Amino acid sequence: MMIRAEELNAAPDSQKLDLLYDLLKNDKTNLVVMKQFLQLIINSGLKRTDPRLAFLFTKLDEHAHMKAASEQSLHDDSTIDGLLLSKEDFIDCIHESCEIVFQALEGEFIIPEFQPFVAKIKNIFDDCKLVTSGKVADYIPQLARMNPNYWGVSVCTVDGQRFSIGDTKIPFCLQSSSKPLNYALAQNDLTAEEVHAHVGQEPSGRSFNELSLDYNKKPHNPMINAGAIATVSLLKTSWKMADRFDYVSNEYKRMAGGEFVGFSNSTFLSERDTADRNFALGYYMQENKVFPDNAKLQETLDLYFQLCSVEVNCESGSVIAATLASGGICPTTGEQVLSSEAVRNTLSLMHSCGMYDYSGQFAFKVGLPAKSGVSGIILLVVPNVMGICIWSPPLDELGNSVKGIRFCEDLVKVFSFHNYDCLRNTNKKYDPRRREVQHQSNQVVALLFSAANGDVSAIRRFYLQGMDVSQSDYDGRTALHLAAAEGHVEVAKFLLEKCRVNPTPKDRWNFTPLDDAVSSSTLFKLYFFFIFFFLLKIKFKRNNVVDFLKQFGTPSTPVRKEKIPSSPTEKIPWSPTPLMESKIKKFAPTTPVPVAAPESE
């Protein structure tokens, strides 16, 4: 069920609440069944734990407690679903959350039809689950002990729609996926110019931990180890070490909307004990004066190892990715955590440098900003749409999750999420941002109006775009029907010769385009056209039908200049053809009977 947006939008809040109650109430009891109401909310993609619904569920919990007390029974959280609320109680529960509730019921989220989208994500997840290659990172024992069968994916849209499947509540360390977050925080505190006085922006073309700097004696970019260490040195440099860590971890938690963000001390200790290369990078950069003047190398490296050891799970990671997708605004809290400029620059570098030595191929195949880590995490960002956290510990030879890479590549094969899928006339993928029914209806209306008005150029354009020009409206009327009825020979010629549509489709009254041609004022033009079409195409194998018809004196028909309705509500004059009248004259033409009768016959 989806509430009509125009009905709710046209009313002030109080009237909206009244209208919503009238739409949801049981007509016999005048009570709202909360189980049905909550199911509508959940189907839109919202979780019961969404902070924006906290007031709603607090009030429902109060009503459930009162109901349990009145019935002298033990309270059970599930009794929320069993509530039947009067108008006053219903409005009392939802008035503080009405904005998000209306958005959910009106289908105004970025993914308006969330369940079909979820079904496709499940299919991709199941396909990737069959992948068994890869090896779990083993340079520290905490990573080596991870179960290689762990596999989880969580999605969070910029409107806070959520979906999780697999092992999405198991904690794991951010590792290198903390690098873009630290870079964004550095730009939040400083300007881009100040940050890039210490670190570059170019892909290095070398290994992520190579002992090298660019021609300016700076790390190439913030997504490799040297650049990430330099970035960490810029985070609250004058603060004490403990305060710096608290600051960054709290910012991570704000990005995650208050969801799980932890810390693995054992991972931190192991990282520090096996960090010879990172210490070498640190001293090399210190020699080349990469760090700010007041930075302390040991503290900088310790903070870097600590931030790599911060834990998330797939669900909280997806909210962090969605915060990046929405320009720094956490989708579940509405809080502006990062500046839009910081996010823009972060996504740019994630796109070009985020996947270790696979970054170029990933940008080519997937075309989306992403950052991976050796724990098996991939933070994937679809700008202005959603963030996805993908986790599977087995890695390929470049340090990226094998299942994660496969999932990302399959994702853009199914959905039009690749950065360049928006190019005109190239995209036939599923776009979950678009209402499929609305898109199909718009296509049919445009196609049929063009055919009825003799607009061959529009029909040609639709055909080149890959549209099915043989599709029909609810009554089974095709573009060929309308071209025949209106006498547009050129449109009929193009549909039959170039598009090779079925010449004899039947509408709900069993009329073919030939029936419409016979009953129209262009009887001889179209009648002979259809007759000779079969003779020339099938029997005599002649190709140029119209030229052949002109030998018999069949002139072409000029395009009729008919008024196109300016709005969907404008009435269009219509009258049945003589053949239609002969079949439906026994019914009143102003009632639904002429439409329903052929179905019953």
Predicted regions and their residues:
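Ankyrin repeat domain, specifically the short helix-to-loop turn at the C-terminus of the second helix
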Residues: 460-468, 493-502, 548-555
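Active-site SXXK
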Residues: 159-160, 173-193, 320, 388
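Primarily EF-hand calcium-binding motifs
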Residues: 13-31, 50-84
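Structured C-terminal helix/loop/strand segments within mature extracytoplasmic catalytic/sensor domains
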Residues: 11, 17-18, 37, 73, ...
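Active-site-adjacent helix/loop patches that line small-molecule binding or acyl-intermediate pockets
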Residues: 104-123, 133, 186-309, 315-318
